Amino acid sequence: MVTVEEVRKAQRAEGPATVLAIGTATPPNCVGQSTYPDYYFRITNSEHKIELKQKFQRMCDKSMIKKRYMYLTEEILKENPSMCEYMAPSLDARQDMVIVEIPKLGKEAATKAIKEWGQPKSKITHLVFCTTSGVDMPGADYQLIKLFGLRPSVKRLMMYQQGCFAGGTVLRLAKDLAENNRGARVLVVCSEITVVTFRGPSDTHLDCLVGQALFGDGVASIIVGADPLPEIEKPLFELVSAAQTILPDSEGAIEGHLREVGLTFHLLENVPALISKNIEKSLNETFKPLDIMDWNSLFWIAHPGGPAILDQVEAKLGLKPEKLEATGHILSEYGNMSSACVLFILDVVRRKSAANGVTTRILSIGQISKSLLILAWFLFSLV
């Protein structure tokens, strides 16, 4: 007679979860950061706000961003002028766009991940879909199943309104799914577009301007599974450990509220200090049991919340400049893509690094909690 323990053991994988493939995509519309203030104040009919525009120009100049990709074009915004105002009701127009475009963009990245994986998409057993946009029923997870032609029996998890820390969260969830379901292959999709947050400027809400200067559109997809098939699947990273914590005294530091005007963004000035003040405690709790105390001995995959956060983390931990190089590259070339950023950075690290067996650290921050993962790096040559 089979015992319950034997059944449970048979349901679990033998080894740890691994990242088996990565795919990324963006909308085709590319926006240069140096000229964005002129465009933004013109399209929002705010050119008369000269001092505010000068402040926004300084924000963009200091952002470390060269360009971003955005679904919203000038033509779309001219057809939806309410989205260009600061407080005009516009949620219906925004929703009509995102419920179509979020899964559509997700399909592009998922297609690339499946191609790299080299296995038929019929072998996908689980789907984790994450976005800050487009709350709807049925959700973007269901729409992707239909668009992509996945099996109707794929087990789905839809994550809305998670924010910037969600890049670490989806990896943690995918790890649990892969390790507790023998043979599971988890398709993860993080699809983000700024349709819900774009709005005109306000003299009294400068943190909204910070968001307009930083956020961009992008989607990333990964496939996660344990016990990779020899000679068939090529593991890129091993997901060793995952943790999450809420920072003390951080309530209200980062907030987003869905209103008739869209998703409003609220950010306190002390966010970089909050993170840098608490980061070493989290690092010690995570790595001391592994006898790792040299933060420069790790690969870093840090979510690029903004230049001030990166600068203070680097200074607090005494990190060498190259440790956050991949993060800086993604911030420069794409801006802050919320949940998708960490997966974009994973892609950069695996493509540029020739290291083998090195511990990797992921840091994703938002709302305001930290998601921590430890990864082991596999040597892998891209064809």
Curated annotation (Swiss-Prot):
InterPro entries named among the record's database cross-references: Chalcone/stilbene_synt_C, Chalcone/stilbene_synt_N, Chalcone/stilbene_synthase_AS, Polyketide_synthase_type-III, Thiolase-like
Source species of the chain: Rubus idaeus
Keywords tagged on the record: Acyltransferase, Chromophore, Hydroxylation, Transferase
Protein name per the record: Polyketide synthase 4
GO molecular function: naringenin-chalcone synthase activity; protein homodimerization activity
pH dependence: Optimum pH is approximately 8.0.
GO biological process: flavonoid biosynthetic process; polyketide biosynthetic process
Recorded catalytic activity of this chain's protein: 4-coumaroyl-CoA + malonyl-CoA + H2O + H(+) = 4-hydroxybenzalacetone + 2 CO2 + 2 CoA; (E)-4-coumaroyl-CoA + 3 malonyl-CoA + 3 H(+) = 2',4,4',6'-tetrahydroxychalcone + 3 CO2 + 4 CoA
Pathway this chain belongs to: Secondary metabolite biosynthesis; flavonoid biosynthesis
